[in-house]
């Protein structure tokens, strides 16, 4: 009771595999606590592609006693190991996987860590489960994105556990959905299309689509309490409100980029400015 079985089957087909990854599948089997086991039917509806494959490798000098988790999918075989190299050594202290190691001892136990860990064993597993792995399963749908999970009990207050693994971009986010939206800047994906007649514009975020559609409908939901003037965007209302307060020169949005002190009156101006920094950084990384 309270456990769901984790089964392993044959190896997937990959274009290549590094020598330190064993391609053998022994009769490994174990169970893990799945606090969201009752929601597996929801998971089945949410994920239409096969679960990702997880593997483990001998800990390197930089992560002795820890486990580097490899996220691999048959849909990303070309830059598979470039992507996994972005992953940090991690523990699963937030996911309550203490029982994962039952019947799967490997000799890498580390008493310095209070949180349960995944240990190196030289095997690859196809994990058939939802629940605690749901957040990581979402990642497989985002090309070039890897999750960063807190590595010890003392780091459970990590505010932004999901990090973009795109080369030259290390932005972190609190929610996986925010990381997914960000990743579309790199992939160019725009899944939201305007359905108004003769308009085929597409957007990477649903809120951008809603804002765009107000141009068609003329809806202006944001009203100034002082003069009753209406606006289609909340940031435009905030900028307008400063004309009543006498703070027209106020610039509350500051650039957080190192050694940059620029400030802006509107948040969208700050976003464009940050994007400029990011583009310059990416160009520099590629040049090196």
UniProtKB/Swiss-Prot annotation:
Motif 9aaTAD mapped to chain: 90-98
One GO cellular component term: cytoplasm
InterPro entries associated with the record: Wilms_tumour_N (IPR000976), Znf_C2H2_sf (IPR036236), Znf_C2H2_type (IPR013087)
Site residues (Important for interaction with target DNA), renumbered to this chain: 263, 269
Keyword terms, alphabetized: Cytoplasm, DNA-binding, Metal-binding, Nucleus, Repeat, RNA-binding, Transcription, Transcription regulation, Zinc, Zinc-finger
Cellular compartments annotated: Nucleus; Cytoplasm; Nucleus speckle
GO biological process terms, semicolon-separated: adrenal cortex formation; adrenal gland development; branching involved in ureteric bud morphogenesis; camera-type eye development; cellular response to gonadotropin stimulus; diaphragm development; epithelial cell differentiation; germ cell development
Molecular function terms from GO: DNA-binding transcription activator activity, RNA polymerase II-specific; DNA-binding transcription factor activity; double-stranded methylated DNA binding; hemi-methylated DNA-binding; RNA binding; RNA polymerase II cis-regulatory region sequence-specific DNA binding; sequence-specific DNA binding; transcription cis-regulatory region binding
Zn-finger region bounds: C2H2-type: 162-186, 192-216, 222-244, 253-277
Start and end residues of each stretch annotated as Important for interaction with target DNA: 206-220, 232-240
Chain spans, region Disordered: 1-21
Chain ranges for the short sequence motif KTS motif as given in the UniProt record: 247-249
Written domain comment of the UniProt record: Binds to DNA motifs with the sequence 5'-GCG(T/G)GGGCG-3' via its C2H2-type zinc fingers. Starting from the N-terminus, the second zinc finger binds to the 3'-GCG motif, the middle zinc finger interacts with the central TGG motif, and the C-terminal zinc finger binds to the 5'-GCG motif. Binds double-stranded target DNA, irrespective of the cytosine methylation status. Has reduced affinity for target DNA where the cytosines have been oxidized to 5-hydroxymethylcytosine, 5-formylcytosine or 5-carboxylcytosine. The 9aaTAD motif is a transactivation domain present in a large number of yeast and animal transcription factors.
Function: Transcription factor that plays an important role in cellular development and cell survival. Recognizes and binds to the DNA sequence 5'-GCG(T/G)GGGCG-3'. Regulates the expression of numerous target genes. Plays an essential role for development of the urogenital system. It has a tumor suppressor as well as an oncogenic role in tumor formation. Function may be isoform-specific: isoforms lacking the KTS motif may act as transcription factors. Isoforms containing the KTS motif may bind mRNA and play a role in mRNA metabolism or splicing.
Extra remark beyond the main annotation: Presence of the KTS motif hinders interactions between DNA and zinc-finger 4.
Family designation: Belongs to the EGR C2H2-type zinc-finger protein family.
Name of protein: Wilms tumor protein homolog
Organism, scientific name: Alligator mississippiensis
Higher taxonomy: Eukaryota, Metazoa, Chordata, Craniata, Vertebrata
């Amino acid at each position: 009771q309270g456990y769901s079985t984790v089964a392993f089957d044959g190896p997937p087909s990959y274009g290549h595999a590094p020598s330190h990854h064993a391609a053998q599948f022994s009769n490994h089997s174990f169970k893990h606590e799945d606090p969201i086991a009752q929601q597996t039917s929801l998971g089945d509806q949410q994920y239409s592609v096969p679960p990702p494959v997880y593997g483990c490798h001998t800990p390197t000098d930089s992560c002795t006693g820890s486990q580097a988790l490899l996220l691999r999918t048959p849909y990303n075989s070309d830059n598979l190991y470039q992507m996994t190299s972005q992953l940090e050594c991690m523990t699963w202290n937030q996911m309550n996987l203490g029982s994962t190691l039952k019947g799967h001892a490997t000799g890498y136990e580390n008493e310095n860590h209070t949180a349960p860990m995944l240990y190196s064993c030289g095997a690859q597993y196809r994990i058939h489960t939802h629940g605690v792995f749901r957040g990581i399963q979402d990642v497989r749908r985002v090309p070039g994105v890897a999750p960063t999970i807190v590595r010890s009990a003392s780091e459970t207050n990590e505010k932004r556990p999901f990090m973009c693994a795109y080369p030259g971009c290390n932005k972190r986010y609190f929610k996986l959905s925010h990381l997914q939206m960000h990743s579309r800047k790199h992939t160019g994906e725009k899944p939201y299309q305007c359905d108004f007649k003769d308009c085929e514009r597409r957007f990477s975020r649903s809120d951008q689509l809603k804002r765009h559609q107000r141009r068609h409908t003329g809806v202006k939901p944001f009203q100034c309490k002082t003069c009753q003037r209406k606006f289609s965007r909340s940031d435009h209302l905030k900028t307008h409100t400063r004309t009543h307060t006498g703070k027209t020169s106020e610039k509350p949005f500051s650039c957080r980029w190192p050694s940059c002190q620029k400030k802006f009156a509107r948040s969208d101006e700050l976003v464009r400015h940050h994007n400029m920094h990011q583009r310059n950084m990416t160009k520099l990384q590629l040049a090196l």
